[in-house]
Amino acid sequence: MADEELEALRKQRLAELQAKHGDPGDAAQQEAKQREAEMRNSILAQVLDQSARARLSNLALVKPEKTKAVENYLIQMARYGQLSGKVSEQGLIEILEKVSQQTEKKTTVKFNRRKVMDSDEDDADY
């Protein structure tokens, strides 16, 4: 019993130390993610005009997956030189429509009706 308690205390202490000091691997990963986010933002700032950036940030609040797809599309177009100048709000709307058509989900509803033994004899008619 003492061994189990000692092991539990060791695990708790180890968890406290890791939480306090942080894992060095996590710090490197967070720094890499932060650099990537800064690079994405700088590319998008060069590619989009003010109104398009505002629309994209509003979309990010509602649909983050779609925003990520549009950002990736814009960054890819910028890297390959397919953009001539900054993308306006109207251009962003057209890109959003293209992405929406590509990722459109078809929903189907299937009714699964259960067959229940129902007898009217048990029901009391009032």
Swiss-Prot record:
Post-translational modification N-acetylalanine, affected residues: 2
Family: Belongs to the PDCD5 family.
Organism: Mus musculus (Mouse)
Modified residues (Phosphoserine): 51, 119
Protein name in the entry: Programmed cell death protein 5
Stretches for region Disordered: 17-36
Xref: Gene3D superfamilies: PDCD5-like
Modified positions (N6-acetyllysine) in chain numbering: 63
